[in-house]
């Protein structure tokens, strides 16, 4: 690896955490050399038989051949499964408990259907547009329907010379795309048409998620990546992106019937707590899995995810106790999610104390996000997608630029500048907010013109479980 001393390969210590200690130019050179999936060389043995004296060249080529570690493969498959657990059943139960009993199945169905749809779209064209080469803003169609992706092709990790089977990377990233779309549905729950959810999800995934993912994560060509933006596991790509889309949806779909006049309460906080717990467990795959290797970098992301979430849960509960006189279970569960969201962009580059600080700050501020800020915005964001994911993602993305500093325990390079990195992070946040906002407005307008957005008032009052899906969660 350029600019880094050689390490004992048996220790596998040259991991993703180390990658972020390099200068931006060095990071670009490494990724340029190893970014494209490669077929394993098959002609070396043939050449050795045909060309006398080829042994030395064969040894040199073998030494430079990409390494696939079975432990990494096992870890990444497990991480992929954990992200699936986050969505179904984690997110589904978290959202399902927050809505009224007459709408719980509709939310579960929306989460399941959106995740399933986007995973299929990811294989069809999403993967190639996000990671299949290309310029600053979008990829190419070179890998349409996974063209050229086989058991032999490899995807690079953050460590020079260490790779994963490309199928593993495709599967892992598909779950990220799927859960991002599913997050959005909470903002306009209890009043939107099912077919409108699916059409919007397809449009938004294509024109918002894929360009942002490419700009932030595809190196060295991605525009925000080239600027030096740090988003280890999806603070901008996933959470700000989804939060803004949810807020736009809350405005354009409109308020629920009776909002502000009738009591609209969660029907089962126990479901929500179970969902939050599953999200916390699954998030270790989301964050630590983003290291792409089972090394010390994954361990750091794992520990930071644990600490930030615990700090956020307590911070939310403390603020709630001060403001309302007592902490609530719903608040504790919401604090868990706020902490998970905020540490997502920073989990691989900040130290444990920085993670605690990020979690505590996010937990406290997101209480305001779902109360005071929500009143200021005057939007019926039913399940507080923007207040938790949007605001939490913004807090985490910005604080990544602070706590990555080595002086604060982070893994940044020796010449790391907080002021410079904070500016880059702010740019990344701004681009994501504007891009997702504009695409979301256009997508909702298209959906409204094609299939309509809302169910009829009578159907909404009866509940979407019966009127949209013909079934009820609770039989009387």
What are these regions (language model features)?
Residues 2-6:
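Extreme N-terminal basic, low-complexity initiation segments
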């Amino acid at each position: 690896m350029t600019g880094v001393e050689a390490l004992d390969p048996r220790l596998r210590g040259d991991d993703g955490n180390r990658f972020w200690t390099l200068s931006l130019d060095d990071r670009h050179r490494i990724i340029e050399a190893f970014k494209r999936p490669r077929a394993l060389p098959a002609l070396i043995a043939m050449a050795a038989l045909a060309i006398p004296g080829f042994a030395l060249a064969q040894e040199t080529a073998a030494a430079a051949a990409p390494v696939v570690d079975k432990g990494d493969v096992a870890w990444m498959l497990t991480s992929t499964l954990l992200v699936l657990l986050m969505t179904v059943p984690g997110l589904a139960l978290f959202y399902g408990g927050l809505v009224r009993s007459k709408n719980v199945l509709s939310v579960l169905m929306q989460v399941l259907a959106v995740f399933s749809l986007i995973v299929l779209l990811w294989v069809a064209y999403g993967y190639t547009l996000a990671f299949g080469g290309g310029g600053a803003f979008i990829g190419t169609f070179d890998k349409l329907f996974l063209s050229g992706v086989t058991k032999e092709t490899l995807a690079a990790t953050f460590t020079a010379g260490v790779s994963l089977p490309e199928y593993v990377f495709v599967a892992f990233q598909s779950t990220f795309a799927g859960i991002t779309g599913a997050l959005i549905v909470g903002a306009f729950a209890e009043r939107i048409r099912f077919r409108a959810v699916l059409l919007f999800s397809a449009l938004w995934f294509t024109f918002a998620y894929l360009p942002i993912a490419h700009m932030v994560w595809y190196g060295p060509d991605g525009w925000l990546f080239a600027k030096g933006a740090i988003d280890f596991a999806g603070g901008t790509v996933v959470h700000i992106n989804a939060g803004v889309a949810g807020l736009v949806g809350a405005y354009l779909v409109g308020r629920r019937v009776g909002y502000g006049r009738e009591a609209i309460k969660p029907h089962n906080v126990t479901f929500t707590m179970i969902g939050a717990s599953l999200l916390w467990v699954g998030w270790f795959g989301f964050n630590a899995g983003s290291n792409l290797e089972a090394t010390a970098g994954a361990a750091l992301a794992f520990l930071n995810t644990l600490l930030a979430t615990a700090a956020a849960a307590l911070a939310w509960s403390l603020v709630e106790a001060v403001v309302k006189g007592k902490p609530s279970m719903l608040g504790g569960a919401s604090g868990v999610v706020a902490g998970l969201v905020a540490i997502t962009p920073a989990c691989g580059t900040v130290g444990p104390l920085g993670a605690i600080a990020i979690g505590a700050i996010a937990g406290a501020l997101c209480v305001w996000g779902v109360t005071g800020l929500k009143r200021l915005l005057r939007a019926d964001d039913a399940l507080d997608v923007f207040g938790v994911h949007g605001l939490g993602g913004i807090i985490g993305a910005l604080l990544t630029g602070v706590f990555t500093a080595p002086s604060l325990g982070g893994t940044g390079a020796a010449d790391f500048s907080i002021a410079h990195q904070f500016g880059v992070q702010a740019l990344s946040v701004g681009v994501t907010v504007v891009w997702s906002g504009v695409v979301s407005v256009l997508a909702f307008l298209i959906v409204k013109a094609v299939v309509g957005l809302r169910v009829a008032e009578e159907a909404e009052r009866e509940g979407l479980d019966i009127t949209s899906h013909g079934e009820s969660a609770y039989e009387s």
